[in-house]
C-alpha cells in the first residue's frame, strides 16, 4: 500500500526476515484499494501473502480466499474477516500501557524519566475455517500457542 507511510519500514523488516530465513519475498505495491483485485490475481502460485494492516481487512481477506492464497496480517481483525491468521502486538495491551504512562505523567513524573518500552504481548489468531477452505492443516504445536482459534 504505497500511500501508507509505514510501508517502507514494513517492507524493510519483511525483507530482512525473509533473507535471514531463506524465504524469497516479492513486493506487490498498490496505489488504491481498487487495484487489489489485479494485485491478488498477479500473486497466483505464491505460497503465502502478508497483507499490510492499513488495507481493508474484509476486502483483502476475501481476495486471499478467492485466489486460494494463505494470508497473514498484523491486524487482529484480519482472521475474523476470513484471513488465515494474524500475528502482532496486542492493541489492547498497548492502549493499557499507554494509559499507565499517561497516569504517571499526570501524577508528576517527567516523560523523559519514563523508560521506552516496546509491545510486551504478541497475539496469534488463527482461522481454522479458512485453513480448511485452503486445504491446510495447522499443526497442533501451532494451535496450542495461538491466543485465539476461530472455528
Indicate residue ranges for each PLM-predicted region.
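Short hydrophobic alpha-helices and adjacent helix-cap/hinge residues
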Residues: 1-151
